[in-house]
């Protein structure tokens, strides 16, 4: 079961004045990947590493990514990774990624194709009471890249 839901992007218009005051101290910007939103965490019910959509639907056909992240979650069982299932080579074929990750009963061929094509790009974590700057540092420290993890 998914523990928390991710923060979604909002239109700046209504918050423009408030945000402008906040911007005086700096601003963080991340590129937007047009992939499939994915939250990865150690499940609270059965302790397996699982992946979910932003609405809580479990993604089943990305075992290669979950297996790779097992050691991370052994060390940090309460962290939730927030990112996109994406492949830059498929940026014009978004439907291909969706069709691969939405499979609820993947065949061996589906699993192999997912292994070949679907990557997880991590750009944040969900960690209570930790500001973005510290979360971004955490992602960089553990995955070696500012804003993104490529598996």
Report each predicted region and the residues it spans.
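Charged, flexible boundary elements
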Residues: 1-22, 29
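Covalent nucleotidyltransferase
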Residues: 17-150
């Amino acid at each position: 079961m998914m523990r928390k839901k991710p923060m979604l992007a909002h239109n700046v218009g209504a918050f423009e004045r408030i945000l402008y005051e906040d911007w005086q101290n700096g601003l963080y910007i991340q590129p937007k990947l047009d992939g499939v939103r994915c939250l990865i965490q150690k499940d609270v019910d059965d302790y397996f590493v699982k992946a979910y959509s932003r609405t809580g639907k479990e993604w089943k056909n990305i075992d290669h990514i979950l297996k790779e992240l097992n050691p991370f979650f052994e060390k940090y069982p309460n962290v939730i990774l927030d990112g996109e299932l994406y492949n830059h080579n498929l940026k014009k074929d978004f439907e291909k990624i969706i069709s691969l990750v939405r499979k609820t009963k993947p065949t061996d061929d589906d699993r192999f194709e997912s292994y070949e094509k679907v990557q997880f790009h991590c750009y944040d974590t969900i960690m209570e009471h930790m500001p973005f700057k510290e979360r971004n540092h955490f992602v960089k420290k553990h995955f070696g890249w500012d804003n993104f993890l490529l598996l």
